[in-house]
Protein backbone atom coordinates (compact mmCIF):
# COMPACT_ATOMS: atom_id res chain seq x y z
CA UNK A 1 0.00 0.00 0.00
CA UNK A 2 1.36 3.38 -1.04
CA UNK A 3 -0.13 6.51 0.45
CA UNK A 4 0.62 10.18 -0.10
CA UNK A 5 -0.11 12.93 2.40
CA UNK A 6 -1.11 16.24 0.78
CA UNK A 7 -1.07 19.48 2.75
CA UNK A 8 -2.99 22.29 1.04
CA UNK A 9 -1.75 25.81 1.76
CA UNK A 10 -0.87 29.25 0.43
CA UNK A 11 1.01 30.22 3.60
CA UNK A 12 4.65 30.21 4.69
CA UNK A 13 4.48 31.01 8.41
CA UNK A 14 6.24 28.97 11.08
CA UNK A 15 3.07 27.03 11.94
CA UNK A 16 2.78 25.65 8.41
CA UNK A 17 6.52 25.05 8.15
CA UNK A 18 6.38 22.98 11.34
CA UNK A 19 3.53 20.92 9.89
CA UNK A 20 5.51 20.33 6.71
CA UNK A 21 8.59 19.14 8.57
CA UNK A 22 6.44 16.96 10.81
CA UNK A 23 4.90 15.20 7.81
CA UNK A 24 8.22 14.95 5.99
CA UNK A 25 9.67 13.11 8.97
CA UNK A 26 7.08 10.35 8.43
CA UNK A 27 7.93 9.82 4.76
CA UNK A 28 9.13 6.34 3.83
CA UNK A 29 8.64 3.76 1.09
CA UNK A 30 4.94 3.44 1.95
CA UNK A 31 4.13 7.06 2.82
CA UNK A 32 5.01 10.00 0.61
CA UNK A 33 4.36 13.70 1.21
CA UNK A 34 3.73 16.80 -0.90
CA UNK A 35 2.53 20.33 -0.31
CA UNK A 36 -0.23 21.50 -2.64
CA UNK A 37 0.80 25.13 -2.85
CA UNK A 38 -1.52 27.79 -4.22
CA UNK A 39 1.11 29.80 -6.08
CA UNK A 40 3.77 29.45 -8.76
CA UNK A 41 7.10 27.70 -8.29
CA UNK A 42 8.83 31.01 -9.01
CA UNK A 43 6.92 32.69 -6.19
CA UNK A 44 7.79 30.18 -3.47
CA UNK A 45 8.99 32.00 -0.33
CA UNK A 46 12.64 31.59 0.63
CA UNK A 47 11.40 29.65 3.65
CA UNK A 48 10.72 26.76 1.30
CA UNK A 49 13.87 26.96 -0.81
CA UNK A 50 15.45 23.81 0.64
CA UNK A 51 12.33 21.67 0.29
CA UNK A 52 10.88 22.91 -2.99
CA UNK A 53 10.96 19.38 -4.44
CA UNK A 54 8.12 18.60 -2.04
CA UNK A 55 5.88 21.27 -3.57
CA UNK A 56 3.17 20.78 -6.16
CA UNK A 57 2.31 24.32 -7.24
CA UNK A 58 -0.93 25.39 -8.84
CA UNK A 59 -2.83 28.59 -9.61
CA UNK A 60 -6.54 29.34 -9.67
CA UNK A 61 -6.36 28.69 -13.42
CA UNK A 62 -7.05 25.04 -12.60
CA UNK A 63 -10.65 26.07 -12.01
CA UNK A 64 -10.97 26.52 -15.79
CA UNK A 65 -8.45 24.09 -17.29
CA UNK A 66 -9.54 20.74 -15.89
CA UNK A 67 -12.88 20.39 -17.62
CA UNK A 68 -14.86 20.63 -14.38
CA UNK A 69 -17.47 23.18 -13.31
CA UNK A 70 -16.29 25.35 -10.38
CA UNK A 71 -18.27 27.37 -7.87
CA UNK A 72 -17.06 30.92 -8.46
CA UNK A 73 -13.56 32.16 -9.21
CA UNK A 74 -11.59 31.10 -6.11
CA UNK A 75 -10.68 27.90 -4.30
CA UNK A 76 -12.70 28.83 -1.25
CA UNK A 77 -15.43 28.24 -0.64
CA UNK A 78 -16.06 24.91 -2.24
CA UNK A 79 -13.38 24.27 -4.87
CA UNK A 80 -10.54 22.85 -2.78
CA UNK A 81 -10.89 19.45 -4.45
CA UNK A 82 -9.53 20.84 -7.72
CA UNK A 83 -5.82 20.75 -6.73
CA UNK A 84 -6.31 17.29 -5.21
CA UNK A 85 -7.69 16.01 -8.52
CA UNK A 86 -4.90 17.78 -10.41
CA UNK A 87 -2.31 16.04 -8.26
CA UNK A 88 -4.04 12.69 -8.72
CA UNK A 89 -4.08 13.05 -12.51
CA UNK A 90 -0.34 13.75 -12.60
CA UNK A 91 0.54 11.25 -9.83
CA UNK A 92 -1.91 8.36 -10.38
CA UNK A 93 0.17 5.60 -8.82
CA UNK A 94 -0.73 5.97 -5.14
CA UNK A 95 -3.31 3.72 -3.54
CA UNK A 96 -4.53 6.40 -1.12
CA UNK A 97 -4.40 10.20 -0.97
CA UNK A 98 -4.74 11.78 2.49
CA UNK A 99 -5.52 15.51 2.39
CA UNK A 100 -4.87 17.96 5.22
CA UNK A 101 -5.86 21.62 5.45
CA UNK A 102 -3.11 23.85 6.79
CA UNK A 103 -4.94 24.68 10.03
CA UNK A 104 -5.48 21.07 11.10
CA UNK A 105 -3.94 20.07 14.42
CA UNK A 106 -3.73 16.62 15.98
CA UNK A 107 -2.88 16.02 19.62
CA UNK A 108 -1.67 12.48 19.01
CA UNK A 109 1.01 11.05 16.74
CA UNK A 110 0.27 11.29 13.05
CA UNK A 111 1.90 7.95 12.30
CA UNK A 112 -0.44 6.29 14.82
CA UNK A 113 -3.46 7.72 13.02
CA UNK A 114 -2.21 6.75 9.57
CA UNK A 115 -1.23 3.26 10.73
CA UNK A 116 -4.66 2.66 12.26
CA UNK A 117 -6.29 2.94 8.83
CA UNK A 118 -3.45 1.39 6.84
CA UNK A 119 -5.41 -1.75 5.95
CA UNK A 120 -8.80 -0.06 5.67
CA UNK A 121 -10.04 -0.24 2.08
CA UNK A 122 -12.86 2.31 2.50
CA UNK A 123 -12.74 4.71 -0.46
CA UNK A 124 -13.52 7.81 1.65
CA UNK A 125 -12.50 8.37 5.26
CA UNK A 126 -13.81 11.68 6.60
CA UNK A 127 -15.69 13.13 9.56
CA UNK A 128 -19.19 14.38 10.39
CA UNK A 129 -20.67 12.47 7.44
CA UNK A 130 -24.37 13.26 7.24
CA UNK A 131 -27.34 12.88 4.93
CA UNK A 132 -29.66 15.68 3.92
CA UNK A 133 -32.24 14.54 6.47
CA UNK A 134 -29.61 14.66 9.23
CA UNK A 135 -28.71 18.28 8.52
CA UNK A 136 -31.23 19.97 6.17
CA UNK A 137 -30.20 23.48 7.25
CA UNK A 138 -26.67 23.11 5.84
CA UNK A 139 -26.40 25.93 3.25
CA UNK A 140 -24.32 24.15 0.61
CA UNK A 141 -26.74 21.38 -0.38
CA UNK A 142 -28.16 23.65 -3.07
CA UNK A 143 -24.83 23.76 -4.93
CA UNK A 144 -25.07 20.09 -5.92
CA UNK A 145 -25.87 19.60 -9.60
CA UNK A 146 -25.55 16.86 -12.18
CA UNK A 147 -26.31 17.17 -15.88
CA UNK A 148 -26.69 13.45 -16.51
CA UNK A 149 -27.70 11.76 -13.25
CA UNK A 150 -30.69 11.85 -10.95
CA UNK A 151 -30.13 11.33 -7.24
CA UNK A 152 -32.50 10.81 -4.36
CA UNK A 153 -32.47 12.97 -1.26
CA UNK A 154 -31.39 10.01 0.89
CA UNK A 155 -28.26 9.62 -1.23
CA UNK A 156 -27.14 13.24 -0.90
CA UNK A 157 -24.25 13.19 1.57
CA UNK A 158 -22.01 15.86 3.08
CA UNK A 159 -18.71 15.32 4.88
CA UNK A 160 -16.48 17.70 6.82
CA UNK A 161 -13.07 17.54 5.15
CA UNK A 162 -10.29 19.39 7.01
CA UNK A 163 -8.65 15.96 6.97
CA UNK A 164 -9.85 13.15 4.74
CA UNK A 165 -8.56 10.22 2.71
CA UNK A 166 -9.57 9.16 -0.79
CA UNK A 167 -8.61 5.96 -2.53
CA UNK A 168 -7.30 5.83 -6.08
CA UNK A 169 -10.58 4.23 -7.10
CA UNK A 170 -12.53 7.06 -5.48
CA UNK A 171 -10.54 9.74 -7.29
CA UNK A 172 -11.01 7.99 -10.63
CA UNK A 173 -14.76 7.90 -10.01
CA UNK A 174 -14.85 11.55 -8.92
CA UNK A 175 -12.79 12.69 -11.92
CA UNK A 176 -15.10 10.92 -14.34
CA UNK A 177 -18.22 12.31 -12.67
CA UNK A 178 -16.93 15.89 -12.52
CA UNK A 179 -15.91 15.63 -16.18
CA UNK A 180 -19.47 14.53 -16.98
CA UNK A 181 -21.08 17.57 -15.40
CA UNK A 182 -21.36 16.96 -11.67
CA UNK A 183 -20.59 20.05 -9.63
CA UNK A 184 -21.03 21.39 -6.12
CA UNK A 185 -19.27 22.35 -2.93
CA UNK A 186 -16.44 19.89 -2.24
CA UNK A 187 -18.02 18.76 1.03
CA UNK A 188 -21.16 17.54 -0.73
CA UNK A 189 -20.15 16.66 -4.28
CA UNK A 190 -17.31 14.24 -3.44
CA UNK A 191 -19.21 12.13 -0.92
CA UNK A 192 -22.44 12.17 -2.95
CA UNK A 193 -20.66 11.01 -6.11
CA UNK A 194 -19.14 8.10 -4.22
CA UNK A 195 -22.43 7.18 -2.55
CA UNK A 196 -24.23 7.42 -5.90
CA UNK A 197 -21.75 4.93 -7.36
CA UNK A 198 -22.18 2.46 -4.51
CA UNK A 199 -18.79 3.06 -2.92
CA UNK A 200 -18.07 2.99 0.80
CA UNK A 201 -17.81 5.96 3.17
CA UNK A 202 -16.60 5.87 6.77
CA UNK A 203 -16.85 8.51 9.49
CA UNK A 204 -13.65 8.43 11.54
CA UNK A 205 -15.10 10.04 14.65
CA UNK A 206 -18.25 10.72 16.60
CA UNK A 207 -21.24 8.41 16.71
CA UNK A 208 -23.21 9.05 13.54
CA UNK A 209 -24.69 6.51 11.14
CA UNK A 210 -21.45 6.28 9.13
CA UNK A 211 -19.31 5.40 12.16
CA UNK A 212 -18.73 1.61 12.28
CA UNK A 213 -19.85 -0.22 15.38
CA UNK A 214 -17.01 -0.32 17.87
CA UNK A 215 -15.31 2.80 16.47
CA UNK A 216 -17.55 5.41 18.07
CA UNK A 217 -15.77 8.49 19.44
CA UNK A 218 -12.29 7.18 18.68
What are these regions (language model features)?
Residues 39-93:
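Active-site-proximal specificity loops/subdomain of glycosyltransferases
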Residues 7-9, 35-39:
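Short beta-strand/turn micro-motifs composed of small residues
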Residues 94-103:
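Short beta-strand-to-loop acidic/aromatic patch adjacent to the donor-nucleotide binding site
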Residues 2-3, 26-34:
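Short loop->beta transition adjacent to catalytic acidic/histidine clusters or analogous donor-positioning motifs
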Residues 177-218:
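C-terminal catalytic/acceptor-binding lobe
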Residues 106-192:
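Conserved catalytic core of nucleotide-sugar-dependent glycosyltransferases
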Residues 13-26:
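Short, well-formed alpha-helical segments that are part of the catalytic scaffolds
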Residues 1-15:
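N-proximal low-complexity "stem/linker" segments adjacent to membrane-targeting elements
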Amino acid sequence: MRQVILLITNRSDISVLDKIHSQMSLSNESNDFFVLYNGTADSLPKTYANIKERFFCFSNDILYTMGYFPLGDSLAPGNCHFPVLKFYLTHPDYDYYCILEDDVTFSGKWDTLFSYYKNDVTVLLSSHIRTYSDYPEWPWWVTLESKEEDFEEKDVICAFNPIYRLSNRALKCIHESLSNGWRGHAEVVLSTILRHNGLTLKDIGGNGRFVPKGEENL
